[in-house]
From Swiss-Prot:
Heterodimer composed of 2 chains; the small (or glutamine) chain promotes the hydrolysis of glutamine to ammonia, which is used by the large (or ammonia) chain to synthesize carbamoyl phosphate. GO terms for biological process: 'de novo' pyrimidine nucleobase biosynthetic process; glutamine metabolic process; L-arginine biosynthetic process; pyrimidine nucleotide biosynthetic process. Belongs to the CarA family. Residues 1-29 form a transit peptide. Keywords: Amino-acid biosynthesis, Arginine biosynthesis, ATP-binding, Glutamine amidotransferase, Ligase, Mitochondrion, Nucleotide-binding, Transit peptide. It comes from Aspergillus oryzae (strain ATCC 42149 / RIB 40). This is Carbamoyl phosphate synthase arginine-specific small chain. Residues 220-407 form the Glutamine amidotransferase type-1 domain. It is an enzyme of class 6 (ligase).
Amino acid sequence: MFAARLFKAMPARASAFPSVNASIQSRFMATVRNGRVAHERATFTIRDGPIFHGKSFGARSNISGEAVFTTSLVGYPESLTDPSYRGQILVFTQPLIGNYGVPSAEKDQHGLLKYFESPHLQAAGVVVADVAEQYSHWTAVQSLGEWCAREGVPAISGVDTRAIVTYLREQGSSLARITVGEEYDADQDEAFVDPEQIHLVRQVSTKAPFHVSAADPQCHVAVIDCGVKENILRSLVSRGASITVFPYDYPIHKVAHHFDGVFISNGPGDPTHCQETAYHLRRLMETSQVPIFGICLGHQLLALAIGARTIKLKYGNRAHNIPALDMSTGRCHITSQNHGYAVDASTLPSDWKPYFVNLNDSSNEGMIHKTRPIFSTQFHPEAKGGPLDSSYLFDIYLDSVRKYKASQSAFHPTRDSLPSPLLVDLLAKERVGVQPTIGMQNVAAAAAAA
């Protein structure tokens, strides 16, 4: 065991309290759990690129998807359950992953997952340099390998992730596959499935509305679920907003008058696949003055709704340490990001302006309407894990929501006293009909699931 080797490697020193040292060692060893799994040969292959051989530590299955990388130091349970990673093979740049295990699916007082961003592991595959078979954390209930195997997600360790990331950075995000227990046939290009050709949002969005009540509700926000993260919902509910979450293609403009605000969530894939969402948002802005806030894919869909364009980045931004400049104040925030597309700021209409800009690559990180309470960010102000420099944006948004509610109550005094036709008390309390990742083993199966 690593922990045992650690203590054996410590130089022996005379101590006035040998029993104390022994107690500390025994207590430390008691927190370390073994999550060893049987290893099998595995191969990570980049289409038209290098091949890497390693060891399997997840599910015994073959998958393909888009290979992307994250430089995040911590937060692998949150990253791997983020619906934005649906259909992607996630390469971790950190040399050791899994050392604090995987926590349970415990829920908080709002009925939201405390440690995961969705109920299931969302990434199609996992690539690491080294995986920790022994793990230690008070919340851990299983190892990373056990979790991947249980969720049906293949994972590979013992590969040169530095070489992989260098290739992806220079050549751009590429299609790749993980094969377990067999050699890759270079002639089988049909084995590479491009998730960009699949409507991934349709897979991860709730299939029916659900409702989460705040402990002390002050307003009611409609959330458009394109693959929403649990901590986004928590960031709204913990600030006094009860939320009703709708499928990505729900005609939100038809029910917006029952809400005090509309929120558009993050999600996976190409934003142009969600044309119906963009259309409903456009109709919403034409027919209502309700405050709107979008994050990540929600930012991109809002841009499409106002006639702007989106572009695909070479290798995307996926990290917890990306600087974004607030163009209205000149302040810089360290932000958490996970996206492969960006908004082309040069295509924004005249009544909109850029809100944030990425100080690494100068890509757009946000936009804001010049006169209406509508704004969006490409980064994640709710970051989990990651910095919370920009979490105040939720406060700005909900302040505008409360002001809108007050103005509507002034014009319509009976608005809040009338029974709601939404019957939110009868709605589900969690996501409806969202299935675990299918890996992308088969195009037909993926299309059918979509």
